[in-house]
């Protein structure tokens, strides 16, 4: 094979390779002049228009065209408007490069086009290679947006589940310890003193003591009676008409001004019990996040 034949073959191969490297937008189903393609930063996009006809390229809605570099500004007008770029050729153009830069919140993008134009007697949709509109799609961006939305939904769902769990735990803690029932609770209490302070019920489950008062009375101050007979302020919480104390004592003293009432635990166990739940209640178990088992 002669050197001239090798040169011609190499040129033909280069031309074929270059043609394959260009990305031709896909024709629309209703009108082939409407074209669509997915963005690929490594591809040259082919644009084909007619002399005197306007061609618009549409980029992502969050992009703004910032720079346009054309090879022949005399015969090819380029007008950017937001995420749109309009072209209009005044003369026949052989394929020539156009470089476009866009900016968005996520950064800058580069687009490389190869645009050409030809003279056409009419501009109907039967004309081959006549583009009126080229619109980009962004599958990678859409997939990333779906992933972000899924992650955000997962976070919202997790926070919602945690809030529900927290509300259930708070509701449970706000309830008096009556879930064990009468057979498991100690009701053996006797009162001594001013009965105007007398609660309707007093009971314990071995861990917590509950005083149940009428709903419209003022709740007195409650003190535990130590073995030496001295008083100590009881740490209690008021839940509606119930007062819950996270301990059991042999005796309690209720005071409201000079009015005093003593309540004695007739079945008091000085050894006591442990709930084995990590809390002061047998019906509320402490669970550490991330703990096994």
Swiss-Prot record:
Which CDD domains does the annotation name? VirB9_CagX_TrbG
Subcellular location field: Cell membrane
Topology within the bilayer: Peripheral membrane protein
Q: Which Gene3D superfamilies match?
A: 2.60.40.2500
Keywords, alphabetical: Cell membrane, Crown gall tumor, Disulfide bond, Membrane, Plasmid, Signal, Virulence
One term under GO cellular component: plasma membrane
Q: Which InterPro entries match?
A: Conjugal_tfr_TrbG/VirB9/CagX, VirB9, VirB9/CagX/TrbG_C, VirB9/CagX/TrbG_C_sf
Query: Which residues are the signal sequence here?
Result: 1-21
Q: Does the keyword Transmembrane helix apply?
A: no
> Any keyword Zinc-finger?
no
Assembly and interaction partners:
Heterodimer of virB7 and virB9; disulfide-linked.
Name the family the entry cites.
Answer: Belongs to the TrbG/VirB9 family.
The job of this chain, per UniProt, is described as: Is essential for the biogenesis of the T-pilus, which is required for virulence and T-DNA transfer to plant cells. When is associated with virB7, might function as a nucleation center for recruitment of VirB proteins during assembly of the T-DNA transfer machine.
Q: What is this protein called?
A: Protein virB9
């Amino acid at each position: 094979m002669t050197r001239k034949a090798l040169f011609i073959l190499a040129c033909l191969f280069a031309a074929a390779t270059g043609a394959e490297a260009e990305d031709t937008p896909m024709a629309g189903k209703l009108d082939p002049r409407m074209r669509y393609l997915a963005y690929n930063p490594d591809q040259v996009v082919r644009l084909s228009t007619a002399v005197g006809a306007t061609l618009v390229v549409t980029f992502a809605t969050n992009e703004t065209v910032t720079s346009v570099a054309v090879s022949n500004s005399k015969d090819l007008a380029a007008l950017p408007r937001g995420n749109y770029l309009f072209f209009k050729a005044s003369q026949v153009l052989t394929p020539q490069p156009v470089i476009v830069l866009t900016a968005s919140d996520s950064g800058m993008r580069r687009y490389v086009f190869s645009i050409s134009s030809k003279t056409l007697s009419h501009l109907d949709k039967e004309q081959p290679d006549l583009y009126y509109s080229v619109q980009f799609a962004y599958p990678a961006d859409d997939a990333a947006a779906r992933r972000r939305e899924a992650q955000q939904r997962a976070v919202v769902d997790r926070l919602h589940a945690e809030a529900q769990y927290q509300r259930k735990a708070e509701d449970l803690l706000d309830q008096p310890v009556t879930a064990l029932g009468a057979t498991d609770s100690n009701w053996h209490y006797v009162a001594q003193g001013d009965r105007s302070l007398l609660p309707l019920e007093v009971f314990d489950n071995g861990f917590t003591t509950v005083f149940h008062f009428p709903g419209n009375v003022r709740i007195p101050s409650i003190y535990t009676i130590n073995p030496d007979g001295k008083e100590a302020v009881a740490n209690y919480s008021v839940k509606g008409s119930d007062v819950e104390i996270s301990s059991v004592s042999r005796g309690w003293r209720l005071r409201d001004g000079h009015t005093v009432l003593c309540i004695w635990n007739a079945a008091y166990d000085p050894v006591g019990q442990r709930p084995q739940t990590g809390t002061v209640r047998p019906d509320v178990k402490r669970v550490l996040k991330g703990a096994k088992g």
